[in-house]
Structures are given as structure tokens and as C-alpha cells.
């Protein structure tokens, strides 16, 4: 429902400042309130297990979910609240032709102009129209906002999210994440060199980079250090045969003015070395101790002191905000990887290289305690590939959750011609092939499987009818409110989601007196969805002393 903004109208008709609603610095757009509401609106959906597409269903703790990622995130909220260690997403970059989600909030131009306050209800223009394409930014913001908001709920307190983006929306993405995650939780804006080869557009810049915005959920996060290479160690040498090994010289000056650290240093021959303007880095007593241990030495003419930083004292290296393609891979490397996996066919445009996601995992995870990695714009499933690769290399036990909308492939594409009718088919097959390749190359004993789920309508019938809509013949159909095509396993997954149980928990099925009984994580949950369960079966289930029991009725 549209309404007149009287405060704005008063200001437009006045040549002096009109008191009204207090202004504040914020990111806003037409449709933001609906986007916020959309994040909190419940859905009548569930996840259904697809065992035929899964690999090692009984033992795997990895997951692949087909469906709208907003719906999937909402369904995962109870089970994975505060449990995800790392999120990586590569969302649509808002090129004008990549909107494929149901909640795109697309507005006609005239409606956008009115909602954004550029005209009144009579069509009179209030300000010059400088935003003819602004509605596309609004659509994109409204699509991303609820997804990022729910994603934050899934992160652990020490969790981190990495977001790939390009120049078109990096500014809006930064402001939106500042609002959702908090500006104090902004970690870095990394520049990734996605291309090395020049594009050769004369008169224009050849663009070779994208961005990766990094946010923590809270200040409890900590980044892992990166491994050092020969390139990083080449500045270290041992010209004086120090028994502590290679070293390089370090700064001895204080960065801030410290009058209590201003003092002269006397050399072994009695010379005086005056302090730097801000003072030394340490107290006089500490300097004397470092001189006695050889950590601080004098140059040959005793005019200055040299501090030694030993290579053996360094634990890895700090990450930098520029990631070069030669270190983490480029888009061309991502294409080559897919080409190798799919027998020289490239079924996906611009896949991210495995090395890029590995770098993200190296920084945000350590492979211990079954850390969960989530990618809800998973595309060709590079993130799943990277999780298996790094687990094979360091013996980690990271688990992945991939979410992807089953977007149809173009009928003229190599993917379609190869039999992959949607992106999910590409992603699942990529995981299967990558797992086979990694296992053959490394022989590592890791989780190579994944459980497949599909977002679907609720397992329950809609039995809430008004009396005038209900016919007498319908009464028999309503005797059971469970849809006829749903199985006991469908019902089990819905119950697990409602109870907040992880879908990676071990599941087992047994037969008790002809009735199918489902066990989740031993006796954490026991469920039977058959009709007419006997008292004897109930007593046998009770003897297991389950934490939770669910029956059909």
C-alpha cells in the first residue's frame, strides 16, 4: 500500500530546514523492509533424502542440497545454528541477466521511481532521475540480504564468511555486510587476481581482479597462519654462523614516542649509540639481556645495533590482502581442473580454482573437530572439491554442505550436450569424479561421500480448511495428514530438522515385528512411522531408553 511521505513533501515545499524524522547514515533501498521480513518469514517446506544420487549415504557426513538457497538456509537454521566454521559464497555479480531466484523483488521502472521517492503519486518528478538502473541494485540487495542474515545465524562465534564479488556490487555488498555482521567484524577486502593474460581492449583497462570480502561473526575469530615458502625465506641467512640458524635484521625503533625508552647504549669498546627519536623498542634491561644472548649485535664500526629475527621462531606467515593467480590459481586454472575431470569438456562457466578455496580453508579452519564448511551458491562444487583435497593433504576432518538451485543448463552448452540438464547434476558429478581422483592420487582415508537432499513441499497435507470449502467426501482423505508419496525416511528427515538434529548423524533402520524403526545416532532419536504399532514394539523401543521417540500418530 502506497502512502505520502509528508515529511519529504514538507521539505520539498520549503526553503528552510523542516524538522522531521532523525536522519542517520545507513544503506537503504526500495524493498529493504520486505527483504528483512523475508529473512524472518517461516516456510512450509522440508528436505527430502535422495539416496540414489548420494555416495556412501550410511557413513558420509557431507551434504549436497538441491533447491533455493534461502529456503535451504531456513530449513537448516535449527540443526546448524552456531555450528558452521567457514562460509564461502560466489553469488551472482548482478550483471543484469543472472537473477534466477524466486524472491528477486523485481520492480517496474515507474514503480521503482515512485518507491524511491523520485515522484509523487500524481507522477510529478521530485528530483532528477539519476538512477535509471537503480532498481537492479535494489533487486540484488533484496535477494542477498535475507540470505546473508540467515548465514550469520549459522556461523559459530569464531566463524568467518568469505564473499566473492566484483566491481559492480562490491560497495553495496560491503555496506550490507557492515550492517548484518557489524563493521567491527570486518576482517579484510582481498584482491584476487583471477586472470593473468591481458584482454587487449584498447582504450580501456584490462580487468584482472575480483574481491573477496571477509567478515567474522564476532571478535572470537582467529585466522590460521599460512605455510612459508622458499620465496618467503630468501631474506634469511646466517653470515655469522649463529647456532640458532638463519636470521634477518629487524627494526629496533619504537613506533610511538616513549620517553622512558630514550637512553644511550654503550658498546663493548665504550662508544655511545644515541637513541632514535621515539626511543628504543625495549627497556635498557631487556636490551642488555638480548645483547648477552646474541639476539642483538653491533655492526662492525659499532655505530648501530642489529636485532636478529630468527627463521626458527616464526610460525608460518600472515596472510596478505593481494592473492596472486600464480599462488592460488586463476579462472583459467579452474576451467582446466574441470576439463581434466570431465574428459576435456568444460560444463561450467568461470569456475573458481580449487587453490583459491584451499587458501580460504587454510586461513579459516585447522581440520580438527569436524569443522563445517558451507557454500550456498555452490555452482560446480569447487568448495566440496577443495574440502576433500585439503583433508587428504593434512588429514583433517572438515565436512561440507553445498547448496545449489537446479538451474537449467543452456541447450546449446557443452554441459547440456553431455547430459547435464541442470547445474546440480554438474556439481554432484564433479564431487564424485574429484573424490575418485583424490583417492587414487593420495590414498588418504577421508570422507569421499555425500548425502543428497532436495528442498520440497512439506510432507504434511494442508488440512486447515474453512467449513464452506470442505466436502463430506474429503473427510476420508483427511484421516491421515501425511502425503501419500512420502516415505518414512522423508518423515525422519523432517523430524530431525524440527528437533534441531544434524542431518549428518548416523542413521540406521531395523525391523521390529514387521515394523520399520529408524535410529538416529544410536538412541538419540528412535522413530516409527508405520500404522498400528503394537504395544510389544513400543516396549522394545522403550527398552532402548531413547532420548527422543516419534510415532506417526
Where are these regions (language model features)?
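DnaQ-like (DEDDh/DEDDy) 3′-5′ exonuclease domain used for proofreading
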Residues: 1-88, 93-146
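Conserved class I S-adenosyl-L-methionine
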Residues: 370-379
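Signature of N6-adenine DNA methyltransferases within the class I
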Residues: 144, 156-158, 167-226
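SAM-dependent methyltransferase catalytic-core segment centered on the flexible catalytic loop
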Residues: 81-160, 168, 209-210, 224-255, ...
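Conserved helicase/translocase motor-coupling segment
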Residues: 498-517
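Cysteine-dependent PTP/DSP-like catalytic domain, specifically the C-terminal lobe
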Residues: 124-139, 185-188, 199-200, 359-370, ...
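Phosphate/ATP-binding catalytic cores across multiple sugar-kinase/actin-like superfamilies
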Residues: 69-72, 76-79, 143-148, 154-157, ...
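Active-site-adjacent helix-turn-beta-strand microarchitecture at beta-sheet edges
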Residues: 216-343
Amino acid at each position: 500500500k502506497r502512502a505520502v511521505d509528508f515529511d519529504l513533501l514538507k521539505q520539498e515545499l520549503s526553503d528552510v530546514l523542516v524538522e522531521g524524522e532523525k536522519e542517520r547514515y545507513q544503506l537503504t533501498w526500495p524493498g529493504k523492509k520486505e527483504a528483512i521480513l523475508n529473512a524472518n518469514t517461516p516456510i512450509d517446506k522440508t528436505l527430502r533424502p535422495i539416496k540414489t544420487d548420494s555416495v556412501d549415504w550410511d557413513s558420509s557426513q557431507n551434504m549436497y542440497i538441491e533447491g533455493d538457497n534461502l529456503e535451504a538456509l531456513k530449513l537448516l537454521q535449527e540443526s546448524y545454528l552456531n555450528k558452521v566454521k567457514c562460509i564461502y559464497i560466489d553469488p551472482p555479480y548482478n550483471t543484469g541477466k543472472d537473477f534466477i531466484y524466486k524472491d528477486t523483488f523485481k520492480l517496474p521502472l515507474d514503480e521503482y521511481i515512485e518507491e524511491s521517492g523520485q515522484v509523487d503519486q500524481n507522477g510529478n518528478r521530485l528530483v532528477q532521475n539519476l538512477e535509471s538502473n537503480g532498481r537492479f541494485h535494489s533487486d540484488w540487495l533484496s535477494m542477498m540480504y535475507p540470505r546473508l542474515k540467515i548465514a550469520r545465524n549459522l556461523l559459530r562465534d569464531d566463524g568467518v564468511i568469505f564473499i566473492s564479488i566484483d566491481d559492480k556490487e562490491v560497495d553495496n555488498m560491503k555496506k550490507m555486510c557492515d550492517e548484518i555482521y557489524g563493521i567491527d567484524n570486518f576482517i579484510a577486502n582481498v584482491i584476487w587476481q583471477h586472470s593473468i593474460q591481458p584482454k587487449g581492449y584498447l582504450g580501456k583497462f584490462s580487468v584482472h581482479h575480483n574481491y573477496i570480502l571477509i567478515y567474522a561473526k564476532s571478535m572470537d575469530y582467529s585466522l590460521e597462519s599460512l605455510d612459508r615458502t622458499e620465496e618467503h625465506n630468501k631474506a634469511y641467512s646466517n653470515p655469522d654462523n649463529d647456532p640458532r640458524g638463519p636470521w634477518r635484521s629487524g627494526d629496533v625503533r619504537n613506533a610511538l614516542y616513549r620517553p622512558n625508552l630514550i637512553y644511550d647504549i654503550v658498546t663493548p669498546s665504550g662508544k655511545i649509540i644515541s637513541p632514535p627519536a621515539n626511543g628504543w623498542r625495549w627497556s635498557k634491561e631487556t636490551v642488555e639481556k638480548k645483547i648477552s644472548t646474541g639476539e642483538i649485535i653491533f655492526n662492525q664500526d659499532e655505530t648501530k645495533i642489529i636485532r636478529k629475527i630468527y627463521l626458527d621462531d616464526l610460525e608460518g606467515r600472515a596472510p596478505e590482502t593481494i592473492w596472486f593467480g600464480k599462488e592460488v590459481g586463476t579462472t583459467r586454472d579452474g576451467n582446466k581442473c574441470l576439463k581434466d575431470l570431465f574428459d576435456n569438456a568444460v560444463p561450467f562457466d568461470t569456475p573458481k580454482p580449487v587453490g583459491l578455496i584451499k587458501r580460504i580453508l587454510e586461513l579459516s579452519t585447522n581440520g580438527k573437530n569436524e569443522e563445517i564448511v558451507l557454500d550456498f551458491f555452490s555452482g560446480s562444487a569447487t568448495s566440496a572439491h577443495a574440502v576433500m583435497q585439503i583433508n587428504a593433504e593434512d588429514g583433517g576432518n572438515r565436512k561440507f554442505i553445498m547448496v545449489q538451485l537446479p538451474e537449467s543448463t543452456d541447450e546449446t552448452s557443452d554441459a547440456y550436450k553431455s547430459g547435464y540438464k541442470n547445474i546440480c547434476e554438474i556439481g554432484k558429478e564433479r564431487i564424485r569424479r574429484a573424490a575418485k581422483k583424490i583417492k587414487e592420487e593420495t590414498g588418504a582415508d577421508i570422507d569421499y561421500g555425500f548425502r543428497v537432499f532436495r528442498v520440497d513441499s512439506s510432507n504434511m497435507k494442508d488440512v486447515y480448511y474453512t467449513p464452506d470449502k470442505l466436502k463430506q467426501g474429503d473427510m476420508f482423505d483427511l484421516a491421515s495428514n501425511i502425503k501419500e508419496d512420502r516415505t518414512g525416511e522423508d518423515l525422519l528427515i523432517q523430524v530431525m530438522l524440527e528437533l534441531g538434529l544434524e542431518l549428518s548423524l548416523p542413521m540406521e533402520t531395523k525391523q521390529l515385528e514387521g515394523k520399520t524403526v529408524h535410529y538416529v545416532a544410536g538412541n538419540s532419536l528412535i522413530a516409527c512411522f508405520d500404522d498400528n504399532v503394537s504395544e510389544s514394539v513400543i516396549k522394545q523401543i522403550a527398552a532402548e531408553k531413547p532420548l527422543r521417540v516419534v510415532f506417526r500418530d
